[in-house]
């Protein structure tokens, strides 16, 4: 057989090397992919599939990649630095596609409805709106940090899950809250009629199209591009300003934004308060009585958008706006944090006249539910509280606040309540109860409390007669152990002793007095629990007879060898001084003696103190 030429051998070797390197690269990529988060892996696989479908097409990151074995440049994709998710091109692209699909489905849904078709014809083409709204929604999603979304959910339940996406708005419109939605749209149409540059025809169009689902799109399409950008900003600001959600977040956000937009363009400030007062008396043409009640509620909510009902935005606007916003609602109705307005019946007024309340305590109680108001507005409220009938403030206090009491700070809440109680002996019952203060134990009628606080000093002549000396835990299943006189301890030890009541308690190294003056270690490896927890010093002392008969101290060499009989070492000649509880110990040891004689004669107990901690 002819020998294989040299060049062929080299070619084969090179091919083998290439195959090995390709295999190694594939293996490395597989490992890297397995360690990657799932979303990133999905992105890369999708991109590779796209590139594989059209091989000649240049990839955005790498050159051309064929569908065959991976190129050496392919690892550049895997090493690509992936920044914040909302800046990722692919995620943006996907989001835009999803939003366009959503919009198409919404438009189809709107076409099926007979009413608002005329309003749809007057709007700009769907293409323009599609360009506008995904950006608006995306920019809002990008601007809302996790903290703000958490704040948004701090409010009362019910509407927590409602976001501004039109799809969810559509679901919400089909739910039983449809009536309130319609009335809020009417009020929105009135608001926009007041805003600068609006014509009656436009507000009429808004009123006609109140059944349309994506309300935000209507608002955006009626603003110039600059204004719509400002409006998006206003939406995110509204998110920051309202940590407590109303019945519908979407409704209140659009309303707050619109009110603020009108207020900022300082032309209409004066007639705003008059309009608010007027709006409340307007009859609504085709709306049921229930709807008018809800409408008036939403109008009050608008009017208070810049008063001190818990909207922090008021702190950023001039104080006079807040004061003016309060005037229309003063004699009418007080809106609470939850957005529910409460009508006053004659019975309520009688109840108020029966128990009048000084305005200072009412003011304090108003602060305690966690209503966050600007300082100027708080002064305004204080001034109004003296002249105004007190039932308005009482109403604010009597409904429990939806904000968690931690907002007010439990200490401050308790202090305010104490002051209020000093001022007014019968405290208002419906106020949310303060967290119970950890005070002295209850009287001995309660068996649980007497067991928990057993031995705590309750003051002269209060409670059951207590034992002198330190406290000990009583386990009800066993007989009560005799109290051993020891160092008196502070009540802090009671708290330490209570949790471990059912467990077996081991003596710590501090509590064992070793005979013969051996080293007392800070912590023995046999000790369970830290010596700081138990302050008792149990001094163990043995009678001489028991020591002579029972205990052997084997020598070191015999222990190491473990061979032959273990030589006895004579016990320490000077046993420790007899202690007051020697007799008890002797009795116990005499009981244990036969057992000890049997067990310890055979093998001495070896305690290795050098074990690992």
Curated annotation (Swiss-Prot):
It holds the Pfam family Phostensin. The modification Phosphoserine is found at residues 54, 125, 133, 175, 195, 224, 368, 432, 490, 530. Residues 424-446, 567-578 have a biased composition (Pro residues). One of its GO terms (cellular component) is cytoplasm. The modification N6-acetyllysine is found at residue 457. It comes from the Eukaryota. Residues 476-499 have a biased composition (Low complexity). Keywords: Acetylation, Actin-binding, Cytoplasm, Cytoskeleton, Phosphoprotein. Residues 295-309 have a biased composition (Polar residues). Residues 18-33, 104-154, 167-191, 199-221, 266-282, 314-327, 340-350, 357-366 have a biased composition (Basic and acidic residues). Residues 18-231, 266-500, 552-595 are annotated as: Disordered. The modification Phosphothreonine is found at residue 199. GO terms for molecular function: actin binding; phosphatase binding. Residues 580-589 have a biased composition (Acidic residues). Coiled coil: none annotated. Isoform 4 is predominantly expressed in leukocytes and spleen. Interacts with Protein phosphatase 1 (PP1). This is Phostensin. It comes from Homo sapiens (Human). The lineage of its organism: Eukaryota, Metazoa, Chordata, Craniata, Vertebrata.
């Amino acid at each position: 057989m002819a020998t294989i030429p040299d060049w062929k051998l080299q070619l084969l070797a090179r091919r083998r090397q290439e195959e090995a390197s390709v295999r190694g690269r594939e293996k490395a990529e597989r490992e890297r992919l397995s360690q990657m988060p799932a979303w990133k892996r999905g992105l890369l696989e999708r991109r590779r599939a796209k590139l594989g479908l059209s091989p000649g097409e240049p990839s955005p990151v790498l050159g051309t990649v064929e569908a065959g074995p991976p190129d050496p440049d392919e690892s550049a994709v895997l090493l690509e630095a992936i920044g914040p998710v909302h800046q990722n091109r692919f995620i943006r692209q996907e989001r835009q596609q999803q939003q366009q699909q959503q919009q198409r489905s919404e438009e189809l849904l709107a076409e099926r409805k007979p009413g608002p078709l005329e309003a749809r014809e007057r709007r700009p083409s769907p293409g323009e709106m599609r360009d506008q709204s995904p950006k608006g929604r995306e920019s809002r999603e990008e601007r809302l940090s996790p903290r703000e979304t958490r704040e948004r959910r701090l409010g009362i339940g019910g509407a927590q899950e409602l976001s501004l996406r039109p799809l969810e708005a559509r679901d919400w419109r089909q739910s039983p809250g449809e009536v309130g939605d319609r009335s809020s749209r009417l009020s929105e149409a009135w608001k926009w009629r007041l805003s600068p540059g609006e014509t009656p025809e436009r507000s009429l169009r808004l009123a006609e199209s109140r059944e349309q689902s994506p309300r935000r799109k209507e608002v955006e399409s009626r603003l110039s591009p600059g204004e719509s950008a400002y409006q998006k900003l206003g939406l995110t600001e509204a998110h920051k300003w309202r940590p407590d959600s109303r019945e519908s977040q979407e409704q209140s956000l659009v309303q707050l934004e619109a009110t603020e937009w009108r207020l900022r363009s300082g032309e209409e400030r004066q007639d705003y308060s008059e309009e608010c007062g007027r709006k409340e008396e307007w009859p609504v043409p085709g709306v049921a009585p229930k709807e008018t009640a809800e409408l008036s509620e939403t109008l009050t909510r608008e009017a208070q958008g810049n008063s001190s009902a818990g909207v922090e935005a008021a702190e950023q606007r001039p104080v006079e706006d807040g004061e003016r916003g309060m005037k229309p609602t003063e004699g009418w109705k007080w809106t609470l944090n939850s957005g529910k307005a409460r009508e006053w019946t004659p019975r309520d007024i009688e109840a108020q006249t029966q128990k009048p309340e000084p305005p200072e305590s009412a003011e304090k109680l108003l602060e305690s539910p966690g209503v966050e108001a600007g300082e100027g507005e708080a002064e305004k409220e204080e001034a109004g509280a003296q002249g105004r009938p007190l039932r308005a403030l009482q109403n604010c206090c009597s409904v429990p606040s939806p904000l968690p009491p931690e907002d007010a700070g439990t200490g401050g809440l308790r202090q305010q309540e104490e002051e209020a109680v000093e001022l007014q002996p019968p405290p208002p019952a419906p106020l949310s109860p303060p967290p119970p203060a950890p005070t002295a134990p209850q009287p001995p009628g309660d068996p649980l409390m007497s067991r928990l606080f057993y031995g705590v000093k309750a003051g002269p002549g209060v409670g059951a007669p207590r034992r002198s000396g330190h406290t000990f835990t009583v386990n009800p299943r066993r007989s009560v152990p005799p109290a051993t006189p020891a160092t008196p301890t502070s009540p802090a030890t009671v708290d330490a002793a209570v949790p471990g009541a059912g467990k077996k308690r081991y003596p710590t190294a501090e509590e064992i007095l070793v005979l013969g003056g051996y080293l007392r270690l800070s912590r023995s490896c046999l000790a369970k629990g830290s010596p700081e927890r138990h302050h008792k010093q149990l001094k163990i002392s043995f009678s001489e007879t028991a020591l002579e008969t029972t205990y052997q101290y084997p020598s070191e060499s015999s222990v190491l060898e473990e061979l032959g009989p273990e030589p006895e070492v004579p016990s320490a000649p000077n046993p420790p001084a007899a202690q007051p509880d020697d007799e008890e110990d002797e009795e116990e040891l005499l009981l244990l003696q036969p057992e000890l004689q049997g067990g310890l004669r055979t093998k001495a107990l070896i305690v290795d103190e050098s074990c690992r901690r």
